[in-house]
Amino acid sequence: MEALVYTFLLVSTLGIIFFAIFFREPPKIQTKKTK
């Protein structure tokens, strides 16, 4: 059970970092399009 919690925490942290990097570049193009 503990292993599952640790794995979930690791995956969630990795997902947040991945999303942060992935959504860090597109906004530049989106802000340019909206303006």
From Swiss-Prot:
User: What compartments host this protein?
Assistant: Plastid, Chloroplast thylakoid membrane
Main localization of the protein?
A: plastid
Which UniProt keywords are given for this protein, alphabetically ordered? Chloroplast, Membrane, Photosynthesis, Photosystem II, Plastid, Thylakoid, Transmembrane, Transmembrane helix
Query: Which InterPro entries did the record assign?
Result: PSII_PsbT (IPR001743), PSII_PsbT_sf (IPR037268)
Tell me a GO cellular component.
photosystem II reaction center
Protein origin, superkingdom: Eukaryota
What GO terms in the biological process aspect are recorded for it?
photosynthesis
Membrane-related topology note:
Single-pass membrane protein
Provide the transmembrane region boundaries. 3-23
| UniProt similarity note | Belongs to the PsbT family.
Known role: Found at the monomer-monomer interface of the photosystem II (PS II) dimer, plays a role in assembly and dimerization of PSII. PSII is a light-driven water plastoquinone oxidoreductase, using light energy to abstract electrons from H(2)O, generating a proton gradient subsequently used for ATP formation.
Q: How does it assemble?
A: PSII is composed of 1 copy each of membrane proteins PsbA, PsbB, PsbC, PsbD, PsbE, PsbF, PsbH, PsbI, PsbJ, PsbK, PsbL, PsbM, PsbT, PsbY, PsbZ, Psb30/Ycf12, at least 3 peripheral proteins of the oxygen-evolving complex and a large number of cofactors. It forms dimeric complexes.
- Name of this protein: Photosystem II reaction center protein T
Q: What is the lineage of its organism?
A: Eukaryota, Viridiplantae, Streptophyta, Embryophyta, Tracheophyta
Q: Which gene encodes it?
A: psbT
